[in-house]
Amino acid sequence: VLIIAVLFLTACQLTTAETSSRGEQKHRAPRSTDKNSRMTKRCTPGGEACDATTNCCFLTCNLATNKCRSPNFP
């Protein structure tokens, strides 16, 4: 009886795998690339206005001038 149960469960798994590989899956999971593209933050280039919460491309905002630093800042 145990051998028959194992064979039955194996056959069920193979049938399910074959069905999903043919594209007959009804509810597909969202692609991870879609999620990653929505989560990507844009940075503010050097010389543009910024504050303490701005994501400057070169990592720092000069709070004295309220502008993102450029790549060749002193």
From Swiss-Prot:
Organism: Conus abbreviatus (Abbreviated cone)
Tissues with expression: Expressed by the venom duct.
Biased composition annotated in UniProt, kind: Basic and acidic residues: 21-37
Protein name: Conotoxin AbVIL
Family note: Belongs to the conotoxin O1 superfamily.
Disulfide bonds: 43-57, 50-61, 56-68
Keyword terms of this UniProt record: Cleavage on pair of basic residues, Disulfide bond, Knottin, Secreted, Signal, Toxin
Region (Disordered): 17-41
A cellular component term, taken from the record's GO annotations: extracellular region
Annotated compartments: Secreted
GO MF term list: ion channel inhibitor activity; toxin activity
Keyword Kinase: no
